[in-house]
């Protein structure tokens, strides 16, 4: 009997664990230290009025707006253990330090210490673990003291007989769990005893949860939950036994009254107001760490968990829920198709065909289905599945039978050919037909004349079969009237004028054949019998290429599956409209390209994932962020030509020096659901400039701006193109000095001086030129005068020479005459002298004659004169 008892207990436990782990649960986004670039441990969470999230991290205050993580240190670089936000202040507590951060005019967080204002109270070894507010006062609680701040003064309190373990606020009161002591209410001055700890099994109350105006729920560390309304009674849950073993550390209630309980040893539990467990996150399914140090429910009703290693974001308010295997040992693989029958879902995966029971939440692999399964489909109450080996028929109890004469199956559709309703099946080799017999679909025959691997089939209104080749192009097939053979086949590798490398996806929308390729959507025109671009669809879906499936919700609503997203399209008044976009990255479960399909079941849409499926309630129109988080300008940074940077005020009239011409604008739109948001930026001003940009990033940089006044505008749009926020900023860049009015005045003075000096220089130059011309003229005149004088001199010389020549001739003649005369006279004188000597003449007469001769004979002086 004892053995049977333990076996039953073990089986129940296993069933419980399977059911608990294999349920639809919210998506979880995990952030690790490498993502936010700070310490591993996170102790507390809070949210600002602008939607930003703040975390007490082992390295300081961590800030996140959905795009950027920033870390802000506190004095001493200590761990931030507690965070509390009131209006524009972010209060923090750390080791021997507490105070608040506040944004400056330039959007920079600055720390203001409050503990430094304490008088006559040493902060030695006091570490602030909790921050609460009551009646406008902020209380900072350590394990040995508490401190109050009224906005002006800081006061310290200590009671060595009563040392608080936790401060909590509930119903407008502060309650306190004392260390190894009882439970109290704190009125701001004194502690009022409420009950002894023995009434909660000698345990510590670690959290309080709302439970009406006059009562609340107390969450204990090791003994579950208790209701307090003056009396104390246990509050039963489905997980009391587990909570007693997992060491509860934190708890919070969501806006829709779901209790989140965080443990030290086994992650997070969610229970409703009746104590029923909704789901459990731990290291085995969604969380990256089991130790929960803080919990917080944000404005969007999603839950943040501060973990011993990282941060977890639970998409509690999302209409998307995920189903994943019970534990790490079960691997679904990639889910290719989903079917629903009764209480069970059937999942065709590349590992096999799985059955998921909604009531027991049990997930099992059906026998003989191992390997690649391409589809599972309920057709008129019969459940078919196709895999690499056979076509399968699934019975009511999950029994599997193989349909004979089938060797593989890739697609099975219900259609009408030549007035007869049939099932048409494709495979790796041939096409097959099923017909109804005794109200059941049974295999009929293989179609002759066609052998090719086909991935998907569609049949148009004229009975033409369009078959997507598994690797290249698409086939257009016409069957014989008796459906026994192929009458005509054409392989198509072009869409329009474009040659398509690879398979061409074929789909059906509103009875119309649609093709998808890397170049967009095409359709078959029944009138022209040509494949033409599907302009209306391409116009609204420019971001989807190579869509691989279409699933009809109604005749006018369709889900299209692309490689990176799912899109809900509606046809209304002759136009197609995008109603919803869901990015695959929302699921943190990458899919194999071109196999992420959709299954629609009443009001719920299911998405195929890798190792799971996601459900989405169609009652929710949009996953897009609302104006709960407004678009704001988070920073404006200006850079100068010499590489200096400065943050600018975010409001007022801002004017920059002329050398600050490069600006970086950062905007903030806090949202955390991985939704498709894009930003439209416009910068106008300067010298008639207008720049427009559309980006995914929440920042934009402008460089080398001209001087002048500018207006910067940023707008945020959701995935449907709806504007969800806008912000405007005005600034001016001063004229550079060389273009300033002072510079122009200086330029005028300089120009005037230049004109003056130029005029003067020009006048002087003209005078100098005239002087030089005059001097040159004088020189020329002098030269001419000298030439004339020289000519005159030459003429005079010539005249003198002529006269001289004439006179020379005369002189020569005279000289010759004189010479001749002298010779005669000399001879005569000689004769006379001889006669005189001889005494032939009278001496007196001769002397007289000789005297006369001597007087007429030229002397030596005469000859000298003649020679000269």
Residue ranges of predicted features:
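Histidine phosphotransfer helical core of two-component systems
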Residues: 820-866
């Amino acid at each position: 009997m004892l053995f049977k008892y333990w076996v039953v207990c073990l089986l129940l436990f296993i069933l419980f664990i399977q059911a608990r782990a294999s349920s639809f649960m919210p998506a979880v986004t995990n952030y690790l230290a490498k993502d936010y670039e700070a310490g591993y441990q996170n102790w507390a969470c809070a949210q600002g009025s602008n939607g930003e999230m703040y975390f007490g991290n082992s390295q300081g205050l961590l800030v996140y707006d959905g795009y950027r993580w920033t870390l802000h240190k506190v004095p001493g670089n200590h761990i931030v253990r507690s965070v509390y936000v009131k209006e524009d202040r972010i209060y923090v507590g750390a080791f021997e330090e507490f105070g608040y951060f506040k944004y400056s005019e330039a959007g920079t967080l600055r720390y203001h210490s409050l503990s430094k204002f304490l008088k006559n109270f040493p902060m030695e070894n006091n570490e602030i673990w909790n921050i609460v507010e009551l009646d406008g006062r902020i209380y900072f609680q350590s394990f040995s003291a508490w401190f109050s701040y009224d906005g002006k003064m800081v006061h310290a309190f200590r009671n060595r007989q009563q040392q608080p373990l936790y401060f909590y606020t509930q119903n407008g009161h502060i309650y306190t769990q004392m260390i190894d002591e009882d439970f109290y209410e704190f009125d701001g001055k004194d502690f009022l005893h409420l009950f002894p700890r023995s009434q909660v099994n000698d345990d510590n109350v670690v959290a309080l949860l709302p439970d009406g105006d006059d009562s609340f729920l107390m969450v204990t560390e090791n003994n579950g939950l208790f209701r307090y309304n003056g009396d104390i009674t246990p509050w039963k849950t489905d997980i009391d036994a587990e909570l007693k073993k997992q060491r509860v550390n934190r708890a919070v209630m969501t806006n829709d009254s779901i209790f989140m309980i965080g443990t030290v040893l086994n992650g997070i539990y969610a229970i409703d107001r009746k104590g029923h467990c909704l789901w459990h996150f731990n290291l085995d399914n969604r969380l990256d760490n089991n130790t929960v140090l803080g919990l917080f429910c944000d404005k969007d009703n999603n839950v943040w968990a501060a973990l011993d290693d990282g941060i977890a974001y639970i998409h509690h308010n999302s209409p998307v829920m995920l189903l994943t295997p019970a534990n790490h040992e079960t691997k679904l693989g990639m889910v290719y198709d989903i079917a629903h029958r009764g209480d069970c879902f059937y999942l065709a995966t590349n590992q096999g065909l799985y059955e998921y029971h909604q009531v027991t939440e049990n997930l099992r692999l059906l026998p003989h289905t191992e390997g690649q399964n391409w589809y599972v489909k309920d057709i008129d109450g019969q459940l078919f599945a196709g895999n690499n080996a056979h076509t399968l028929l699934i019975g009511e109890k999950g029994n599997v039978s193989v349909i004979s004469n089938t060797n593989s199956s890739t697609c099975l559709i219900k259609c009408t050919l030549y007035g007869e309703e049939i099932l048409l099946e494709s495979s790796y080799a041939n096409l097959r037909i099923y017909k109804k017999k005794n109200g059941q679909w049974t295999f009929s025959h293989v179609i002759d004349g066609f052998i090719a691997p086909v991935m998907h089939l569609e049949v148009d209104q004229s009975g033409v079969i369009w078959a997507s080749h598994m690797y290249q192009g698409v086939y257009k097939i016409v069957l014989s009237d008796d459906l026994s053979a192929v009458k005509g086949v054409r392989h198509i590798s072009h869409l329009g004028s474009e040659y398509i490398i690879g398979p061409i996806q074929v789909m059906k929308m509103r009875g119309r054949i649609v093709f998808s390729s890397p170049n967009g959507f095409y359709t078959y025109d029944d009138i022209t019998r040509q494949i033409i671009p599907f302009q209306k669809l391409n116009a609204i879906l420019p971001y989807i290429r190579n869509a691989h499936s279409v699933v009809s919700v109604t005749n006018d609503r369709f889900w299209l599956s692309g490689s990176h997203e799912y899109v809900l399209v509606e046809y209304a008044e002759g136009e197609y409209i995008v109603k919803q976009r869901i990015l695959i990255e929302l699921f943190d479960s990458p899919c194999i390209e071109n196999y992420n399909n959709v299954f629609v079941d009443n009001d719920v849409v299911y998405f195929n994932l890798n190792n799971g499926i996601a459900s989405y309630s169609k009652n929710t129109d949009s996953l897009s962020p609302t104006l709960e988080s407004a678009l704001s300008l988070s920073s404006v940074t200006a850079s100068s030509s010499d590489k200096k940077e400065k943050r600018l005020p975010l409001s007022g009239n801002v004017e920059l020096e002329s050398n600050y011409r490069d600006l970086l604008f950062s905007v903030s739109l806090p949202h955390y659901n991985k939704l498709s948001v894009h930003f439209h930026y416009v910068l106008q001003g300067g010298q008639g400039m207008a720049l427009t940009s559309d980006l995914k990033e929440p920042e934009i940089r402008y460089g080398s701006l001209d001087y002048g006044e500018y207006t910067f505008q940023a707008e945020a749009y959701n995935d449907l193109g709806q504007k969800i926020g806008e912000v405007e900023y005005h600034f001016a860049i001063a004229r550079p000095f060389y273009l300033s009015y002072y510079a122009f005045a200086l330029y005028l003075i300089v120009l005037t001086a230049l004109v003056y000096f130029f005029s003067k220089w020009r006048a002087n130059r003209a005078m100098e030129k005239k002087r030089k011309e005059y001097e040159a003229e004088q020189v020329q005149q002098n030269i001419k005068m000298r030439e004339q004088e020289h000519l005159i001199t030459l003429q005079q010389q010539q005249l003198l020479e002529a006269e001289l020549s004439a006179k020379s001739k005369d002189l020569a003649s005279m000289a010759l005459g004189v010479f001749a005369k002298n010779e005669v006279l000399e001879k005569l004188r000689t004769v006379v002298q001889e006669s005189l000597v001889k005494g032939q003449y009278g001496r007196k007469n001769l002397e007289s004659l000789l005297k006369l001769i001597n007087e007429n004979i030229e002397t030596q002086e005469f000859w000298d004169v003649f020679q000269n």
